[in-house]
Regions:
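Primarily marks secretory-pathway-exposed extracellular/lumenal segments that are disulfide-
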Residues: 1-63
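Catalytic cores of phosphodiester-bond hydrolases, prominently lipid phosphodiesterases
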Residues: 62-340
Length: 340
């Protein structure tokens, strides 16, 4: 007697598995695997070789520079080194002269050279009129018994108005202000409102990761503001720089005494200022030795020491008499250093 062989799908993993089948007939049908969503473009930075379906999340390396260098675009803000002018407004061009001056040329020359971080001091022109309209940039110490504006003052609406114009024209640059503030917080905010900078200010959450430069650019939050006013918390876009960062010593006696030890602030924070200017015997900024302090090789070597000490490059290289030496070139070279 001839017994017919039962043919069918004999694979238990198939949708049409036939447990009665004695011989596989090639008819097995298998379920479609669940899609794995991700970036399927091998040229993308976040290519996922496991992905089967593209979800539109592919990210590509920027080719247009951010702050002058394409490699900076995808770096977090705190991993970029910015050239910075100390008391940026206190210049001969702005009619503030020695001993109160820190530079010869004003904002426009600084910006054109590549400066993208600026230290500013806000004061009232006189104590008798502490109104918003009386805010000025002045360099001095009221504890000496006379107004900090005695040596001269700079109109902050004009100065910051120039900054706003340049930020608008350089859409790929992130700018930082560090403000030694001696006026009401609301008056400082009103000043930034007046010149059109407020909408650009980034708000950072303490101890969270800093965004990359391209993320700040895409958010159109291209201005980061630090200040010295820790008790004021109603203005979150003004970041207390001793809470959100730290600083090395400033106004050293000699370049040989410059180090990377924290002077003020929270050295557990990743943002820090490498202050890099000298004082003379009178305690004033020393223009006679600015070329020595601002020497490119010296600044890069010092930054390298800071990287070795703290595991990251300094966020700011802050100088006096920026026209001497080349802090912009030094910052560029520091940004090329490989950090473990």
């Amino acid at each position: 007697m001839i017994v017919d062989i039962v043919r069918g799908c004999t694979d238990e993993n198939a949708e049409n598995y036939n447990q009665s089948a004695e011989e596989d007939d090639g008819s097995c049908v298998y379920p479609e695997p669940d899609p794995v969503f991700g970036c399927t473009d091998p040229d993308a930075m976040n290519y996922d070789e496991e992905a089967t379906d593209d979800d539109g999340t592919c990210e590509y390396m920027e080719t247009i520079p951010c702050n002058g260098m394409a490699i900076l675009c995808h770096r977090p803000y705190d991993q970029v080194t910015f050239p910075e002018t100390h008391n940026a407004f206190s210049t001969h061009e702005d009619n503030i002269f020695y001993p109160a001056s820190n530079h010869r040329t004003g904002f426009q020359a600084q910006w054109n050279a590549g400066m993208r971080a600026f230290m500013l001091d806000t004061h009232y022109l006189n104590d008798a009129d502490q109104s918003a309209s009386n805010v000025r940039f002045c360099h001095g110490d009221s504890s000496r018994g006379f107004s900090p504006c005695t040596y001269g003052n700079v109109d902050p609406w004009v100065w910051l108005g120039k900054l706003e114009s340049e930020i608008q024209s350089e859409e790929r640059d992130i700018v930082t202000l560090l403000i030694e503030n001696h006026v009401e917080a609301d008056h400082l905010k009103a000043l930034l409102d007046d010149v059109g900078l407020s909408d650009m200010m980034y708000i950072h959450e303490l101890n969270s990761e800093w965004p990359t430069l391209i993320e700040l650019i895409n958010m159109d939050k291209r201005l980061v503001v630090f200040w010295e006013q820790p008790s004021e918390t109603s203005h979150p876009y003004f970041h207390d720089f001793l809470t959100f960062g730290w600083t090395t010593n400033y106004a050293d006696d000699s370049t040989s005494s410059m180090d990377c030890n924290p002077l003020r602030g929270d050295d557990s924070q990743p943002v820090y200022h490498m202050n890099n200017w000298l004082k003379n015997q009178a305690g004033l900024s020393d223009p006679t030795r600015s070329a020595e302090a601002n020497d490119v090789d010296f600044m890069v070597e010092r930054a390298q020491e800071c990287i070795e000490d703290h595991g990251k490059r300094p966020t700011f290289l802050a100088v006096d008499w920026w026209e001497d030496g080349d802090v912009v070139e030094a910052a560029r070279l520091v940004n090329l250093i490989e950090v473990p």
